[in-house]
């Protein structure tokens, strides 16, 4: 050991152990790097691997999490402390660009010029800096604006199993916010499919939305360290737009479950005792550190939309359950609605929002939303009777209610701009006032004579009436 110690220079270390994505590095006495410091390791193939200090083990050794593949590393390799955490570029020049967890461009273009660099580990805004305004963010998506309206500067969770349309809904939100509100968006791909990220990038170029968006990716083929930290990289870029540019920013995280999953993988390698269902014991702390930075201040706001994969459709799993605690609104996507061919497959009875309050949205909006939910709930209760005895056994009032419920169910669907190439239907942005008007008319029975098929994939109520007229 004495021989190794002689080789250790100031700020230089030697790799002593490699366990998958976690490695131990021994430094000279008194030259230990701090927790969260970035350390660079030059590989034999010329690439530089960045690792982040996670633990001090004693005996001048630190345990680090790799942000890239560890293949090609051997014990005894040199490692150099940088004296700072991982820092990433921020500012207007990052718009239209695509980065990895370290802030390096991955769109085959040069690194952005004239940018500041922020460390990815930062404190949440102080208590007195935070703003508590209640203002609705209009999305142009009927089911969202009516039943689970989003708060400007709030946190929204998109819950759903595999393949129910979370990513498509996120893409539509990015399109609508950029075209209708002119706001900046930061899209953070955490542990999802590279193909989807690639599709999203080219779709955004085609629609012209890319110039208002910064994209950060740590996809599912990358080591757990990158997937665990890429959320912080995207958040740091969004914080700059909020604090320095004074903008209202949309931060998309697809998928927040993968952040937890990566933490779980790393936690086991770091030697921590697993807790419930094998998750890391620090699950609440890690989630809190990320979520508390997503907030509105006096300068601007960050509205965050987070896709939440629900393992085996089990909402009581610790990962989605921990996420729930931080959210202002939940948009639940349901497989049973996908099976009906209704998109977006938002469950109108499971989705909730703290904003659905007459003091925030107004009496009319609140009443229409509650009436819609009441009719759909009653229809749900009647479905067992219909399945056993058939429609004929229902009372006249119930028959009318079922007919209206089926129209409402279909009218909650909507063609999306980002899905035009698949559906062949032009996308529709529906203002809140038109949404309320349409559902109010259905509830009042003004369209009882129109067949329910006309309501499927329509924009506002005028689109439905135009279809009826065209087919006469």
From Swiss-Prot:
Record flagged with keyword Cell membrane: yes
Coiled coil (residue ranges): none
EC primary class: translocase
EC number: 7.1.2.2
GO terms assigned for molecular function: ATP binding; ATP hydrolysis activity; proton-transporting ATP synthase activity, rotational mechanism
Sites where the protein binds ATP: 160-167
Disulphide-bonded residues: none
CDD domains: ATP-synt_F1_beta_C (cd18110), ATP-synt_F1_beta_N (cd18115), F1-ATPase_beta_CD (cd01133)
Catalyzed reaction equations: ATP + H2O + 4 H(+)(in) = ADP + phosphate + 5 H(+)(out)
Quaternary structure and interacting proteins, as annotated: F-type ATPases have 2 components, CF(1) - the catalytic core - and CF(0) - the membrane proton channel. CF(1) has five subunits: alpha(3), beta(3), gamma(1), delta(1), epsilon(1). CF(0) has three main subunits: a(1), b(2) and c(9-12). The alpha and beta chains form an alternating ring which encloses part of the gamma chain. CF(1) is attached to CF(0) by a central stalk formed by the gamma and epsilon chains, while a peripheral stalk is formed by the delta and b chains.
Function comment: Produces ATP from ADP in the presence of a proton gradient across the membrane. The catalytic sites are hosted primarily by the beta subunits.
Family to which this protein belongs: Belongs to the ATPase alpha/beta chains family.
Stated name of the protein: ATP synthase subunit beta
Gene it is expressed from: atpD
């Amino acid at each position: 050991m004495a021989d190794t110690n002689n080789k250790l220079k100031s700020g230089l270390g030697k790799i002593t152990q490699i366990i998958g994505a976690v490695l131990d590095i021994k430094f000279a006495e008194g030259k230990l790097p701090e927790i969260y410091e970035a350390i660079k390791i030059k590989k034999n193939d010329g690439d530089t691997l960045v690792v982040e200090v996670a633990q001090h083990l004693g005996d001048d050794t630190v345990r680090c999490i790799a942000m890239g593949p560890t293949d090609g590393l051997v014990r005894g390799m040199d490692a150099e402390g940088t004296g700072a955490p991982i820092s990433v570029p921020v500012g207007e020049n990052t718009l239209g660009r695509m980065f990895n967890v370290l802030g390096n461009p991955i769109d085959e273009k040069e690194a952005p010029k004239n940018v500041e660099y922020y460390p990815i580990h930062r404190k949440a805004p102080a208590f007195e800096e935070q703003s508590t305004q209640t203002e609705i963010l209009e999305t142009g998506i009927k089911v969202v604006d009516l039943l689970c309206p989003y708060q400007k500067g709030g946190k929204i969770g998109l819950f759903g199993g595999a393949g129910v349309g979370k990513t498509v809904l996120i893409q539509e939100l990015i399109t609508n916010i950029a075209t209708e509100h002119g706001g900046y968006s930061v899209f953070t791909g955490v542990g999802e499919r590279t193909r989807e990220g690639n599709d999203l990038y080219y779709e955004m170029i085609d629609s012209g939305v890319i110039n208002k968006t910064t994209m950060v990716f740590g996809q599912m083929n990358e080591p757990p360290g990158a997937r665990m930290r890429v959320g912080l990289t995207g958040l740091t870029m969004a914080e700059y737009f909020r604090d320095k540019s004074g903008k209202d920013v949309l931060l998309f995280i697809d998928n927040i479950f993968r952040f937890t999953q990566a933490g779980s993988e790393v936690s086991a390698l770091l030697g921590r005792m697993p807790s419930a269902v094998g998750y890391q014991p620090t699950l609440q702390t890690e989630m809190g550190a990320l979520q508390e930075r997503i907030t509105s201040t006096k300068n601007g706001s960050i509205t965050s939309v987070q896709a939440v994969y629900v393992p085996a459709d089990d909402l009581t799993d610790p990962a989605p359950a921990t996420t729930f605690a931080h959210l202002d609104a939940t948009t639940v996507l349901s497989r049973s609605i996908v099976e009906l061919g209704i998109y977006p497959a938002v469950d109108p009875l499971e989705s909730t929002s703290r904003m659905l309050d007459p003091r925030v949205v107004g009496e009319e909006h609140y009443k229409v939303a509650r009436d819609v939910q009441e009719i759909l709930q009653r229809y749900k209760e009647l479905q067992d009777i219909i399945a056993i005895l058939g429609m004929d056994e229902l009372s006249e009032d119930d028959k009318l209610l079922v007919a209206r419920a089926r129209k409402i169910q279909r009218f909650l669907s909507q063609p999306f701009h980002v899905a035009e190439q698949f559906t062949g239907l032009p996308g529709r942005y529906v203002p809140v006032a038109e949404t309320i008007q349409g559902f109010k008319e259905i509830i009042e029975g003004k369209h009882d004579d129109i067949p329910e098929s006309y309501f499927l994939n329509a924009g506002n109520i005028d689109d439905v009436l135009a279809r009826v007229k065209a087919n006469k």
